[in-house]
């Protein structure tokens, strides 16, 4: 059985419209949270052409899943603003947030149509998973080159109460497992931590696609400090617990535990 995970609340903060276009204001906003993080809007979706009403609600740009054309535009002004904000901050202390493919496709199309495609357009959906996987890896490489040390990858809809266990298992098989293998290959050239939302983590663990390896500390450490020091795949708890301290956590190891 795949466990559910109750998200840890991270209350939204009021944001001035100018913050979306002003690197200095964006950097100040990024520093004011529980941990320093960018972007303040889903940058992958923005670079794929999505607009956000009032900085919150995505305006889908496709009617049918077959119409989706995944062309990343790194000349997008939102991306350039984020990079400038990152330069103001310390990249080595900034978490880069990435939303998973279901969230991105929701922005591009609308979630109800994506869920319909899970049943009727599986091949089209899997092709989009493959393309998004490559887009994510390319984006991660760009951020690593700028000195980023921690990434947070979330897929908030990945809950058996919403999608059902069968669809979550398909998501893991068709996207997540292979994507994470690509991420881990980057460790050959870079040192960084890749943090998964626990919803993804427990899907992997409960489907026997991964296992935990415990790390203990002599004294409790803030979770955010652990993430910046471990250089590994992690995610046994929500990143919104960044300011909480723990004396032990778990790394995630892909594959079966044969020990």
Q: For each of these PLM feature ranges, what is it?
A:
Residues 1-58, 168-195, 200-259:
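N-terminal basic, low-complexity leaders that serve as flexible interaction/assembly modules and, when applicable
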Residues 18-19, 41-77, 150-168:
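Glycine-rich, proline-tolerant flexible connector loops at the mouths of alpha/beta enzymes
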Residues 34-38, 86-91, 141-147, 184-188:
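Acidic (Asp/Glu)-rich catalytic clusters
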Residues 49-53, 97-117, 146-172:
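Active-site-proximal loop/short-helix segments
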Residues 53-142:
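Active-site-proximal, glycine-rich beta->alpha crossover segments in alpha/beta enzymes
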Residues 76, 138, 158, 258-259:
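Metal- and O2-centered redox machinery and metal/ROS homeostasis
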Residues 94, 151, 191-193:
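Hydrophobic/aromatic residues located in beta-strands of well-ordered beta-sheets
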Residues 131, 152, 180-181:
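Non-heme di-metal
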